[in-house]
Amino acid sequence: MGFLSKILDGNNKEIKQLGKLADKVIALEEKTAILTDEEIRNKTKQFQTELADIDNVKKQNDYLDKILPEAYALVREGSKRVFNMTPYKVQIMGGIAIHKGDIAEMRTGEGKTLTATMPTYLNALAGRGVHVITVNEYLSSVQSEEMAELYNFLGLTVGLNLNSKTTEEKREAYAQDITYSTNNELGFDYLRDNMVNYSEDRVMRPLHFAIIDEVDSILIDEARTPLIISGEAEKSTSLYTQANVFAKMLKQDEDYKYDEKTKAVHLTEQGADKAERMFKVENLYDVQNVDVISHINTALRAHVTLQRDVDYMVVDGEVLIVDQFTGRTMPGRRFSEGLHQAIEAKEGVQIQNESKTMASITFQNYFRMYNKLAGMTGTAKTEEEEFRNIYNMTVTQIPTNKPVQRNDKSDLIYISQKGKFDAVVEDVVEKHKAGQPVLLGTVAVETSEYISNLLKKRGIRHDVLNAKNHEREAEIVAGAGQKGAVTIATNMAGRGTDIKLGEGVEELGGLAVIGTERHESRRIDDQLRGRSGRQGDKGDSRFYLSLQDELMIRFGSERLQKMMSRLGLDDSTPIESKMVSRAVESAQKRVEGNNFDARKRILEYDEVLRKQREIIYNERNSIIDEEDSSQVVDAMLRSTLQRSINYYINTADDEPEYQPFIDYINDIFLQEGDITEDDIKGKDAEDIFEVVWAKIEAAYQSQKDILEEQMNEFERMILLRSIDSHWTDHIDTMDQLRQGIHLRSYAQQNPLRDYQNEGHELFDIMMQNIEEDTCKFILKSVVQVEDNIEREKTTEFGEAKHVSAEDGKEKVKPKPIVKGDQVGRNDDCPCGSGKKFKNCHGK
């Protein structure tokens, strides 16, 4: 209890401090009320001018803290004049918490949108841009349109960033004081900005301050989903079809084992024997059969662990992922690692080609790049540890403006799902007769349709809100609080939407919320409850459970089943006890703990790629922003030459290999005959460097003389092509390394440490290959002046296609190099490049 008391005391202390500062804002109400509209806008200009004279971000933040009461008072007065709404004290407190870079946890209906206007205005005064982030484009559009009235009144500009906007429109949106956008679009724009060829093609400014609405949904629920920009990879889809046919033949327990708790599925020995016969291979687990076993495992996952209308839907011949937290489909998103193709094979729709990742980032790493990050939501306290550890954000529970009157009733648990759903329908019928509006929450699309059919049989008119008809969301939600309304909704039930009570509903007990199953996350259950009882309204909530629910099957239903059997309870008799609720909450905590651990592991692995991505993007940006790229090229020429001397000449064990060294120099830098063995034999390494460097320098100058003012554009083109080509291959190689790295634990190795070490080695090899290619293309390309090198057009990202540096050539995919394989220096390199080992990964 000591730890819990500390948390509660900490929140109470924070609330008192916020309350005192909010009182200072309210105290300025009369003084602000006498200002004219023009005087308010002049105040904004004054703040902006004073902040523009401060070039240090920390000093700017100190100044913002100083003017906070006056700035917030201006926003309150502006809101009063524009919307005829004055933010309450609790909203001011929430706004202060957000300005501090924390999360304001505010109940549904407490006015988070208006709360955010105060910290948004204050931080936008610095002129560095504020991003207000919502979970979907509909909310971004609505909020930007509504709030622009207030911000324009105060003298600030507002932009809206949508996926459909052109590059110019996006750039203009980001240039405004305040920009509304979705988290997805921000992440993709960041990746695109780091794939352009010219600085003027970028759309974003440096990331300064972000306020995330429904912050738990974006930073927790979506943290494990990376944003990926990809191009198609040429690969046959026939193996998916074969694996699908094979998976359909298999029987559980005989041919494969399935663990419902972990959702892991794998072949038994009998299943492996069948696979060897079906695919005509001697040993399924031989290295050369890795593709076969990978496709079989993926097909098994598609058939056993994923259900249609629960995990995905098929719409117009296309497989669409269903977001497990919102119930919405996610057009454009695809399962990775071939799983989407396996589902397409399972459902008999066209199998689309696999894609090759060109750029990727997780939300965890994207949002940690902001100077300051804050958020608001109705449900965050259960995930406070994760917010603190990963994002350095504290969760502050803001009091409600009016006391909560909702009655949260104990869970009712039934033996079977049939008994549960019968009871749910009876409850709905009873409430409907009285005229009380009912909101039924379901976890899956198929459940919502099942209940809908039961209600139809009883003659109850109702609306269904799920991924299949989400376009009517606003209309359905608007009517959900009216007398006699019955609404069935998946978890999408209104993140960012308010259910307002109709006339006479308060007297009937307000909105009744019925949950038909517990979600694995307590936050999602709390969000469903929170649809009722907004702003002091009456309401009630209750969850109906059964021992056949997925969460109960995965965790602890056996004990309850024995207990219910001893009591002699039948299908129609529920248990209502604190023990049941505690057991369910305990199961949820275990799932949440597992998910947190998984997100932490992802972050640890992603940290390796984050550092590498930072180096590559910085390198690209410096090439784009520098007017003269010759210094970069010069450094690459020198380091590549020095590396070759260290390898061929400075050998501790062997005699210097003069001829192989000359062959390498001729391949990368010079023409045959430019350097002979007589030129370098008997000389030490330093002298050899000087002799060869003089020749390279002359060849480099010769290219400059031919191309003259076009040389810089030529170098930039070669550098960017080389970086992009090798970086794309490197991402693919790192992905392959990561997919199999967990198997190292069976050999008592540390998978994360191995991934870090080998990832570092692969990155070093990639950087060397970039330098080699750049040197070779710049010195060995035959370019005529009349070729008139034109500026390359930046890749069209809308189609997520990327033009390779060597159009028309089929790229050889690098194979992982297994340590311990004895490869001769003159043997072909096992990476598959076609070069000798000593000239490739043997350097």
UniProtKB/Swiss-Prot annotation:
Pfam families in the record: P-loop_SecA, SEC-C, SecA_DEAD, SecA_PP_bind, SecA_SW
GO cellular component: a single term: cytoplasm
Annotated SMART domains: SecA_DEAD, SecA_PP_bind
GO molecular function, one term: metal ion binding
Residue stretches spanning the membrane: none
Catalytic activity, EC: 7.4.2.8
InterPro entries (alphabetical): Helicase_ATP-bd, Helicase_C-like, P-loop_NTPase, SEC_C_motif, SecA, SecA_CS, SecA_DEAD, SecA_motor_DEAD
Residues reported in the UniProt entry to bind ATP: Q91, G109, E110, G111, K112, T113, D498
Compositionally biased residues, Basic and acidic residues: 799-813
The protein's role, per its UniProt record: Part of the Sec protein translocase complex. Interacts with the SecYEG preprotein conducting channel. Has a central role in coupling the hydrolysis of ATP to the transfer of proteins into and across the cell membrane, serving as an ATP-driven molecular motor driving the stepwise translocation of polypeptide chains across the membrane.
Protein name, as recorded: Protein translocase subunit SecA 1
Organism in which the protein naturally occurs: Staphylococcus aureus (strain NCTC 8325 / PS 47)
Gene name for this UniProt entry: secA1
